[in-house]
Amino acid sequence: MAKKSKIVQNERRREIVARHAERRAELKAIIKSPSTTPEARVAAQSELNRQPRDASPVRVRNRDSVDGRPRGHLRKFGLSRVRVRELAHQGQLPGVRKSSW
C-alpha cells in the first residue's frame, strides 16, 4: 500500500496537468511551428518555463487504482501486476483466464 500522501500528491498533479493542458499544447505548437518568428518562439518558451513543473504530464505516475502501488502498473486494467493476479485468481476480472499451453 502506497503512502496516502503520495497518492494525493499524484491526484493533485493530474488536476494541474488537466488545468494547463490546453495552454501547454498551444505554446508547444508555437514553438514547433517552422513559420514562427524567433522572438515569438522565445516568448512561448519562456511562458512554458513559467508554468508550474507539475503541469507537465511526464510528472504524473501511473498507480494501482486500488492501493496506489506505483510499480508494475498494467494500463489495460489500471491495476498493478500483483492486484491483477489476485483478482484474476478470484475470477473478478471478466474475460481473464489463466493461460495453459
Curated annotation (Swiss-Prot):
Residues 31-73 are annotated as: Disordered. Residues 61-70 have a biased composition (Basic and acidic residues). It comes from the Bacteria. GO terms for molecular function: rRNA binding; structural constituent of ribosome. GO terms for biological process: translation. The keyword rRNA-binding applies. Keywords: Ribonucleoprotein, Ribosomal protein, RNA-binding, rRNA-binding. The keyword rRNA-binding applies. GO terms for cellular component: small ribosomal subunit. Binds 16S rRNA, required for the assembly of 30S particles and may also be responsible for determining the conformation of the 16S rRNA at the A site. Part of the 30S ribosomal subunit. Contacts proteins S3 and S10. Belongs to the universal ribosomal protein uS14 family. This is Small ribosomal subunit protein uS14A. It comes from Mycolicibacterium vanbaalenii (strain DSM 7251 / JCM 13017 / BCRC 16820 / KCTC 9966 / NRRL B-24157 / PYR-1). The lineage of its organism: Bacteria, Bacillati, Actinomycetota, Actinomycetes, Mycobacteriales. The gene is rpsN.
